[in-house]
Amino acid sequence: LSLVGSEMCIRDSNYMDVKPDSNRPSVAYFSMEYGLNHVLKIYSGGLGVLAGDYLKEASDSNVDLCAVGFLYRYGYFTQTLSMDGQQIANYEAQNFGQLPLDRVLDENGKQVVVDVPYLDYYVHAYLWRVNVGRISLYLLDTDNEMNSEFDRSITHQLYGGDWENRLKQEILLGIGGILTLKKLGIKKDVY
């Protein structure tokens, strides 16, 4: 039994050293949410759990994949009920310093900023990284002093706000995601 355990530890320690299979196309995966762990509140349910499972399986299957999404300040709400049975949505701010993620830094040690065009101005998003096995998940965060209060809220809540904010989220994910990969020098075969 201990020999089997030792062999498994050796095999698992080499797991992360294996390079992606270059015979398969490389992939850039974009999603509004990723269900990786309850600690990181960047998902609400089915789509997020599925997207998170894709990343975990890509890592296990040695697929050359990276992903882009959002680092939500408040995530999705937690639900409580009032005395008369009405739903109450509670939003709790995430403390990014206590989450399993890292700031993406440039060669000067400054956090990387992605500048995303919106009509006649730019929204500026900080870049964070979560390691999902061998897979890098890059998260965009607009809650910073470079943006107006209105644009800081783009990444406050998953699916939160009005239709305009939702459209801004979709622009940030699509255009901002491509700009993120370009800024990091990442090129993939399939998007």
Predicted regions and their residues:
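Extended, Lys/Arg-enriched charged tracts that mediate electrostatic binding to polyanionic substrates
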Residues: 13-15, 44, 84-131
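Short, small-residue-biased leader/transition segments that mark boundaries at the very start
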Residues: 3-10
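Structured, charged N-terminal subsegments at the starts of enzyme catalytic cores
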Residues: 20-38
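A conserved hydrophobic secondary-structure block that centers on an alpha-helix together
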Residues: 37-68, 147, 154-191
